Amino acid sequence: MTAPAEVEVRGVLDRLTDAWNSGDAAAYGRLFTEDADYVTFFGANFPGREAIESSHRALFEGPLRGSKLTGSLGGAAKVRFVRPDVAVAVVGGGSSLTGAEVADEGRESTVSFVLAREGGEWLITAFQNTRVSDPRG
């Protein structure tokens, strides 16, 4: 795949980080397709842009107020193109509830994204967040 498309995909992930770090649920939601699926680390599914935005508004105004995603999602992601208009990105990252630059213990995740090019722009159509844990318990 061409480098410009990969740069655009990485840019979406960086804008996602910026929206989270700003607590901007509307900007966060705009990065998803209307029919996106958003699966949280605990298995809940928020289907559709509206549900993704409203759930994040509640989080950003409540328990995740002031939280930060650590690192650069776009910079760290492994990106591959399934077709010219569909990309998969996988990235390790984490979050800090105190706004620190390093993830809080137990808040490291591996996140998988499927992005689709719609109307000339890349949007996230599927999101899966999985907490990193020791398989030995």
Language-model-derived ranges and their functions:
Residues 11-12, 71-74, 110:
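Short, conserved clusters of charged catalytic residues that mark active-site
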Residues 77, 93-95, 110-114:
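Hydrophobic alpha-helical segments of small multi-pass membrane proteins
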Residues 106-137:
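Short beta-strand edge/turn micro-motifs at domain boundaries
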